[in-house]
Amino acid sequence: MAHHPRWTLSQVTELFEKPLLDLLFEAQQVHRQHFDPRQVQVSTLLSIKTGACPEDCKYCPQSSRYKTGLEAERLMEVEQVLESARKAKAAGSTRFCMGAAWKNPHERDMPYLEQMVQGVKAMGLEACMTLGTLSESQAQRLADAGLDYYNHNLDTSPEFYGNIITTRTYQERLDTLEKVRDAGIKVCSGGIVGLGETVKDRAGLLLQLANLPTPPESVPINMLVKVKGTPLADNDDVDAFDFIRTIAVARIMMPTSYVRLSAGREQMNEQTQAMCFMAGANSIFYGCKLLTTPNPEEDKDLQLFRKLGLNPQQTAVLAGDNEQQQRLEQALMTPDTDEYYNAAAL
């Protein structure tokens, strides 16, 4: 059966051109049809292999091509990863994401990656990984280990992509998403706002995501975190309303997907984050760092949740785990500032 695109570029452009308050109203209506508007899914991201990446993504401090002062590290030991997962669960996260800075995993790494997935799943957490390009067999092995989600961002529109990355094609990214989907793993894929792209490019990114045969279950929208030493370090700041508008359009186009506020939250004030939740964002990364840049401290997130009347969402495997819920609400975790990193760098 042929796949028919759900959206056209002109339709998406019309959404971006709507008056902001009208757009937010529509996005909130769509959101309430599919989600509890007071619940936010909480994830933690750990860099399991940091730095020395051979790719040339211009936004990324982990690329070996740029002098950002980041020290390269080897793949973490399985038990180190699982200890971080235990801390994440104690802090209230329901999904544990593991990211590695490389173009693709080597076969010698696969047994360790499988053990990490199995260990995280044994704790009752959802497991997510972002490891770059996957082969069919690698995707299947991760699926067999129990991986719930695989993150592989498209970053921007096909037209603007070549200005940001030359070491991996757009089609390679789409092919990896297809292999992940075929293996039975849920897809997490989104992009970055602030790369120097136009509004048309933002529309083009969301068009690609929404028109996949099955849209991603999770759509992270990152605000560029400018890191000294990277080619995009001097880019203009992203206008908050432009970012909120992108969140709202993503919610309308992908009504059943989780839309995640990912990298860049440290740069957003409470009012901007609140408007993002109003626009339909319903997932965050929770922890002190996301790959090499700050993320709001846990207690700040909890204070904001209280102000807005939001609640952390539990996964099906954790439903009824009152202890886990209470831990999150009481913010008992001591921040582990050396381990949590920024999602936009993968």
Swiss-Prot record:
Gene coding for it: bioB
Subunit structure: Homodimer.
InterPro entries given in the database record: Aldolase_TIM (IPR013785), BATS_dom (IPR010722), Biotin_synth/BioAB (IPR002684), Biotin_synthase (IPR024177), Elp3/MiaA/NifB-like_rSAM (IPR006638), rSAM (IPR007197)
Binding site for [4Fe-4S] cluster: C53, C57, C60
Pathway(s) it belongs to: Cofactor biosynthesis; biotin biosynthesis; biotin from 7,8-diaminononanoate: step 2/2
Catalytic activity: (4R,5S)-dethiobiotin + (sulfur carrier)-SH + 2 reduced [2Fe-2S]-[ferredoxin] + 2 S-adenosyl-L-methionine = (sulfur carrier)-H + biotin + 2 5'-deoxyadenosine + 2 L-methionine + 2 oxidized [2Fe-2S]-[ferredoxin]
Entry function: Catalyzes the conversion of dethiobiotin (DTB) to biotin by the insertion of a sulfur atom into dethiobiotin via a radical-based mechanism.
Family classification: Belongs to the radical SAM superfamily. Biotin synthase family.
Domain of life of the native organism: Bacteria
Catalytic activity, EC: 2.8.1.6
A GO MF term: biotin synthase activity
EC class name: transferase
Gene3D superfamilies on file: Aldolase class I
Protein name listed in UniProt: Biotin synthase
